[in-house]
Regions:
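Extended, compositionally biased non-globular segments
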Residues: 130-156
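Hydrophobic, membrane-facing alpha-helical anchors
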Residues: 20-37, 56, 79-93, 112-116, ...
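Aromatic-anchored, glycine/proline-accented short structural segments
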Residues: 77-139
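Membrane-interface helix-loop-helix junctions at boundaries between adjacent transmembrane segments
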Residues: 2-78
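Cytoplasm-facing juxtamembrane segments at the starts of transmembrane helices
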Residues: 33-54, 71-74, 90-115, 154-156
């Protein structure tokens, strides 16, 4: 929405963008606080990536907001949170309790964060580092492939 509004009024689009970022950070902070307070590894689901890593979506529209420092900070925040969560999530999925059938659709979210970080990085940084691009691309392809294979095995 903010992106489209910038075509008519840059300031209005920027205000909406900043408000959305602040609201997202508040919701993500609340989510992290409440989940950390009573943390149980077996309660972790791939959908837990949405609040902390979803902020990287702001990078995709950030290039039109003329705020490169904020866009870079948002990317780094989302990417660091993803790097913290990924090993814990993989450990939970491999060694934790089996995900209940009603929660299996949430497993498909596993493929999104690496792809989102790649899209955010390519959009936020005008001269992306090829090593970072290669790493994020390989990670996105690997995890998405694992999700597809797992979905096939789950259905069978």
């Amino acid at each position: 929405l903010a992106y489209i509004i910038t075509y008519f009024s840059l300031v209005s689009g920027q205000i909406i963008w900043y408000v959305a970022i602040i609201l997202h950070l508040i919701f993500a902070g609340s989510f992290i606080y409440h989940r950390a307070k009573d943390f149980d590894l077996n309660h972790m689901l791939p959908s837990w990536y949405v609040p902390p890593v979803g902020i990287v979506v702001a990078c995709v529209t950030g290039s039109h907001m003329h705020a490169p420092i904020i866009t870079h900070a948002i990317f780094y925040l989302g990417f660091i949170l993803y790097c913290i969560m990924l090993p814990a999530m993989m450990y939970r999925l491999v060694f934790g309790d089996r995900i209940q059938d009603a929660q299996l659709p949430a497993f498909a979210v596993m493929g999104a964060p690496a792809s989102l970080c790649l899209a955010g990085y390519l959009t936020a940084f005008p001269n992306p580092n090829p090593m970072i691009v290669d790493f994020l691309l390989a990670l996105a392809l690997m995890i998405t492939t694992l999700v597809y294979i797992s979905m096939y095995r789950i259905k069978a």
